[in-house]
């Protein structure tokens, strides 16, 4: 899927640092779909993301909003990364 114009699902109550953390994670997810992303980098970005969005319900809401806007699933990207021991994650068609 090609990169389109869409808005990121961000919470206005987040600090600049928290927004940067979430955007970095979403960027890693985009890379997994558009080309490839290093598994370890994606999981590190996810770990940092979970410090901003620790709850499962909030994570699912953000994933749903991001998937509706972009077509990319954070859940599927993290699942694919966890399934690999090393290397790159590629989810694009």
UniProtKB/Swiss-Prot annotation:
Highest rank taxon of the organism: Bacteria
Residue pairs linked by disulfide bridges in the UniProt entry: none
Cross-referenced Pfam families: UPF0223 (PF05256)
InterPro entries membership: BH2638-like_sf, UPF0223
Family: Belongs to the UPF0223 family.
NCBIfam families, alphabetized: PRK04387.1
Protein name: UPF0223 protein stu0998
Organism listed in the record: Streptococcus thermophilus (strain ATCC BAA-250 / LMG 18311)
